[in-house]
Amino acid sequence: MKEYKDTLNLNTTTFSMKGNLSVNEPKTYAKWQEQQAFKRMQNRKDNHGDFTLHDGPPYANGHLHLGHALNKILKDIVIKREYFKGNKIYYTPGWDCHGLPIEQQILERLEKEKTSLENPTLFREKCRDHAKKFLEIQKNEFLQLGVLGDFEDPYKTMDFKFEASIYRALVEVAKKGLLKERHKPIYWSYACESALAEAEVEYKMKKSPSIFVAFGLKKESLEKLKVKKASLVIWTTTPWTLYANVAIALKKDALYALTQKGYLVAKVLHEKLAALGVVDSEIAHEFNANDLEYLKATNPLNQRDSLITLGEHVGLEDGTGAVHTAPGHGEEDYYLGLKYNLEVLMSVDEKGCYNEGIIHKKLLDESYLGEHVFKAQKRIIEQLGDSLLLEQEIEHSYPHCWRTHKPVIYRATTQWFILMDEPFIQNDGSQKTLREVALNAIEKVEFVPSSGKNRLKTMIENRPDWCLSRQRKWGVPLAFFIDKRTNKPCFESEVLEHVANLFEKKGCDVWWESSVKDLLPPSYQEDSKHYEKVMHILDVWFDSGSTFKAVLEDYYGEKGQSPSDVILEGSDQHRGWFQSSLLIGCVLNNQAPFKKVITHGFIVDEKGEKMSKSKGNVVSLDNLLKKHGSDVVRLWVAFNDYQNDLRVSQTFFIQTEQHYKKFRNTLKFLLANFSDMDLKDLERSHNFSPLDHFILETLETTSTGVNSAFEEHDFVKGLNILMAFVTNELSGIYLDACKDSLYCDSKNNKKRQAIQMVLLAVASQLCYFLAPILTHTIEEVLEHSQVLCAFLQAKDVFDLKGINILEKLRLKEFKKPENFEAVLALRSAFNEELDRLKKEGVIKNSLECAIEVKEKALRENLVEELLMVSFVGVAKEKISETPAFTLFKAPFYKCPRCWRFKSELENTPCKRCEEVLKER
């Protein structure tokens, strides 16, 4: 029998089924860098508008992990999406270069080398070199993810001009009266020997002693109450702070019960405390808290007086309703102390050990000197003697240092703060506090997800003053001079601008290298002996929080618009970068420095647990890239609901790889089947069939849905819409139905050419929607299709832009076939019956069938195409009957070329195929 395979249009494409991504992507990315692809993107002439994404800086320390990849890939998708829409994009990647983690790395290295480095300038030089090294490492690792940006000129917070910009932002804060030096309790990391800001604290579970202690009322207080004995019972989980107790706070207007044995507790808590055995069960007297105010009790640890006060912070849900108050070790205690003029006792050093203050003020005996507060707690509890009513151990959420992961303490020290509740002058001449301005600014910002707005609002509503000062070396200094004659900082513009100019020319190292005289402007040098330098450095959150100023407003000039259109970071940045940027923006410009905040979740393992080396559940980014390639990693990011935590395992990446293969194989099929088109056919009108109109209308609906989802940055929704179209309507219906025409019709057949135009339109939309995500793959698609490039008028992926399918195909509208849903329903029922007949061995495939349809209104040619049968009508040999249709054996012979049963003679081509063969 004659072979007809060579007469079919079995077109091929050089676009490979296998991407071999891990080998090919690095070559593509190197080419993009060499050709300065990002600059080309910025210089495209058909820009419709501007779009700025301001990069929250990663820390220049260590290699990238999957969390970095998630963040940078999402940003890259957002940026490229805006670019392909036709906007001019601004994106300058940056790095946070100062701070404690780098200091710790250098200190550990020096310790291993058994050397010390007292010279701060040399120490800072080592820190700078470390940051430079990892900045380059991370930059190259980012580029392997297929991300684009101004990586040739990124921002670095350690650049001299950048340091000057950070300092100038600080100066603005000072000039507006919001920067003050205060002696108050703040989070203190004894492991880092430095103050911490709210954003540098993480909460973890910790076991602590839980003790109930009786403070006996003094004789005069007992006489006022007309009782013989009474002891206020306090509850605390920080016994080490009892040495600094100066007061006990009660709940205003609440009733307090005095038991028969003389213990005073809140009445509503008495029953619970009696059940615990803290107090006896019989109540002898009741007192209103207001009548107890200003009475005095005795601290059983050191016999010092403890004033009874009323506090708004006192709750009646737990404890005793009587709160141990040590203004040197608690913020609420401190503010209560201001109200009652309480003494601030704080005798704990930088390392968290008791210092000589405990001896001078007779707070503890000298045996505690130099002992760490947490280690001392056992002895303190023993020393309480009979005053200890109950001791337990509890596990509770406790603040820890985010860098060392060690517990922190509250410790009153002299630090510099940005004040949240100090009114300052607004642009309209009114006065508002920073808290008020920030809360108002939040209302004008869009949040994705929307829950982020309330989260940030709540944090701003409840946050304390911002502790800015750090007792470290690697950072931007709080470069102010204290006038020793007044003990006040010098905020004169001439002095501050002179320092800023020095930083811009020489960097911040000059603050350590130069004398006071050399740092002052000439007009102040004569009085230099009256000034001394502040030697604290700035909280690194101030560095990163002021990046919008340096990148978008001053130093980097044409790097984007301020406020930026979007910032995009992990959800933990509500308490970090989002807050610091918001607060600095509100001080400098009375507005948020961003219009939209997008947040993503964290990377967790397949069980939803946090990844850690100790658990052995870390998935290596480098291994993923080597095994799957960056486009698969990018697709995994986009195909997940990034607003929640992303679960990751090899299983998830294998699933993503299947999605990738579906897109790739579909594109390969499309490319192959329009590869033989004459480019002249792109410029003329075509007569599209009802089936063509169906898929084009579905493509239009799909495009609208994907566009809408992508506009909301809901990439997983958009991709699911796209994948459903590719799987169901395109592959499941249209391509199957068109294969006969594509393979068997003449190359010049008008129907076939119309189908090819449809395939071009589909490929165009797939490229447009997938380009922000699978940029390398779409670049590869265009490299392998001259026809598609001509249709899109694009030589590579960076020429892509949205197209109007109707205009491109010279159509006024898409005309969906009448009764099409009925044909699809018929197709579904037919396929079900076909499966049964195949299993029973009656037939092998649908082409062996003829079908008589009961619903006569259905178009025969559409039924034949969609059901892929050889004949519509009645035939002799019935094989099945259903309420909707009757199936027969096809009444003709199988065509050896197209395999449809349409030949009048055995082993002879059908009429259609004969005509095609004559043309060859």
From Swiss-Prot:
**How are the domains described in the entry?**
IleRS has two distinct active sites: one for aminoacylation and one for editing. The misactivated valine is translocated from the active site to the editing site, which sterically excludes the correctly activated isoleucine. The single editing site contains two valyl binding pockets, one specific for each substrate (Val-AMP or Val-tRNA(Ile)).
> Gene Ontology cellular component?
cytosol
The taxonomy runs: Bacteria, Pseudomonadati, Campylobacterota, Epsilonproteobacteria, Campylobacterales
- Tell me which family the UniProt entry assigns to this protein: Belongs to the class-I aminoacyl-tRNA synthetase family. IleS type 1 subfamily.
Q: Name the residues that bind L-isoleucyl-5'-AMP.
A: 569
Task: Write one Gene Ontology MF term.
Answer: tRNA binding
Q: State the Pfam families in the record.
A: Anticodon_1 (PF08264), tRNA-synt_1 (PF00133)
Subcellular location, principal: cytoplasm
Q: How does it assemble?
A: Monomer.
Tell me its cofactors.
Zn(2+)
- Segments carrying motif 'HIGH' region: 58-68
Q: Which reaction does it catalyse?
A: tRNA(Ile) + L-isoleucine + ATP = L-isoleucyl-tRNA(Ile) + AMP + diphosphate
Q: What is the annotated localization of this protein?
A: Cytoplasm
Residues involved in ATP binding: 613
Q: So where does this one cross the membrane? A: none
GO annotation, biological process: isoleucyl-tRNA aminoacylation
Briefly state the protein's biological role. Answer: Catalyzes the attachment of isoleucine to tRNA(Ile). As IleRS can inadvertently accommodate and process structurally similar amino acids such as valine, to avoid such errors it has two additional distinct tRNA(Ile)-dependent editing activities. One activity is designated as 'pretransfer' editing and involves the hydrolysis of activated Val-AMP. The other activity is designated 'posttransfer' editing and involves deacylation of mischarged Val-tRNA(Ile).
Per the UniProt entry, what species is this protein from, by scientific name? Helicobacter pylori (strain G27)
Q: What is this protein called?
A: Isoleucine--tRNA ligase
InterPro entries tied to this protein: aa-tRNA-synth_I_CS (IPR001412), aa-tRNA-synth_Ia (IPR002300), Anticodon_Ile_BEm (IPR033708), Ile-tRNA-ligase (IPR002301), Ile-tRNA-ligase_type1 (IPR023585), Ile-tRNA_ligase (IPR050081), M/V/L/I-tRNA-synth_anticd-bd (IPR013155), Rossmann-like_a/b/a_fold (IPR014729)
Note on cofactor: Binds 1 zinc ion per subunit.
Q: Keywords assigned by UniProt? A: Aminoacyl-tRNA synthetase, ATP-binding, Cytoplasm, Ligase, Metal-binding, Nucleotide-binding, Protein biosynthesis, Zinc
Where along the chain is Zn(2+) bound? Answer: 895, 898, 910, 913
